[in-house]
Amino acid sequence: MKLLLLGDLHFSLKSSSSRVDSIVEEFLYRFKDLRDKIAENGIMAVICTGDIFNTPYQSPETIFKLSKEIESLGVPFITAIGNHDEIGYRLENWQTQTSLGILKKITKNLHISDMYLGEDFTASFQHFIPEVDTETNGKYLSYYSESKVDNYLIHVVHGYMVSGKLPFHVVNPSEIADTNADFVLAGHYHKPVYEKIGNKMFYNPGSFANLTYDDKDRICEVGLLDTSTNALERLSVPYDKGTWVIKTDTKFKKKELILEETIVETDSVALITQIAKNKQLQADTIERYWEVQNGE
């Protein structure tokens, strides 16, 4: 069976402060490309890594617009729950208090659960929890499926699975190479990641949206997975890069410099201590740090 693998969606009708154009047209163009890829390749389902919306509270217009786009794909849309889909990083509130809960109720082909049983594959999900990337007794348990199936197993995790190092803690594919899944699909981090270790694949397509100025030149991609042959094809998603602006005022540059000096700290406790002592660091800069820390 052929599946389309999609990174964090971050759907919104509002452009970021770095853009002067409308992000809506870009989203709609990308969904059209998804429909074309589904038709051309005989795709039977889409699996997404979460962060369906950019924030947990969205307008009715935004919710209905995304519902229409998901239903237009014509195949099951199966997703994890990301940190942007939750309130206060609490997984239990998504159904009753968030826009994702409303979207689920009105979108016929949207599937959200801990496990999805496909025709010849099983998808298990580790939705976002604050301890998703925490090591326990030498293992990163969130990257191991609790499913006991005989068919092709895809484990979807909304967590920082990254090749190499970052200024904050991440999980390297080599650290979870003995996972019981055939394929680990991760989100949260917005740049593509791919490694194959033995017969197992570890993949993050990267975010479906280019939300920040630093991310403006990244080419969006999706994965085409054939579960019958365990083969992955990475496909680019063409789009209009949009119109971006650079904030060049002195105040912004000073805050940017302070943040750059501060983020060198890799220990979160030390970092927050430094922030607390630094009177020059404005609230919006602190907020931006946490956005970076949480993959936003």
Regions found by a protein language model. Give the residues of each.
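Active-site neighborhood of phospho(di)ester-bond hydrolases with catalytic His/Asp-centered motifs
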Residues: 5-7, 45-51, 77-84, 111-115, ...
